[in-house]
Amino acid sequence: MLLKSLEGAAFGAKLKEIAGRKEFHALPESPFIYSIGGGNQLSSDPDYPSLLMAAQKAVEHGYRVFMLPNPHGLKTPDYIFERRGVYKLFDLKNISGKNIVHTRLKESIAQGNRALLNMPQYNTRKLVHDIRKYFVKYPDAIEVLIFKGKNEMSVSRRFALSARFYFEFKRMFEK
């Protein structure tokens, strides 16, 4: 059964089953980050340092992180995050330039319906516009999780499409 065909509790149960597989081993540098083979297979990936850095930020925010292998030629999410028994699938998008969020979110929808944006700084008005546009254009999108420095912000579809999104998000983002 394909993971994409599952919804709700069945989807969460399948993620829990995947995360519970014996092939996942904790990384020596962090007991809350797991990967297939303990990181040996991932460490040759050129994206490994940024994947590991974002995983470490997730651990700081209370998640257990399961780093998923990325087979060549296939678009797959990067992580399973678990916190308080809730399992979620995320695709990492590092944001390093201006006017790039829209493009990175567009790329992520092919890999999953939750995106993780790891960013140092970004124009709030542009970010609000890009996130709202993402949820309007892609009805399957569920959540955008943002790591900005030591802060974590979760944006759901409902929040992004609400009338007060800009004001509430600005208050949280510009702390």
Model-identified regions with their sequence ranges:
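A short acidic/basic microdomain associated with nuclease active sites
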Residues: V59-G73, P77-D78
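Short, solvent-exposed polar/charged micro-motifs at secondary-structure junctions
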Residues: K75-I80, S154-R157
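Metal-dependent nuclease catalytic core centered on acidic motifs
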Residues: L2-V65, I95-K175
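Conserved catalytic cores of phosphodiester-cleaving nucleases, focusing on short active-site segments
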Residues: Y79-F81, G85-N94
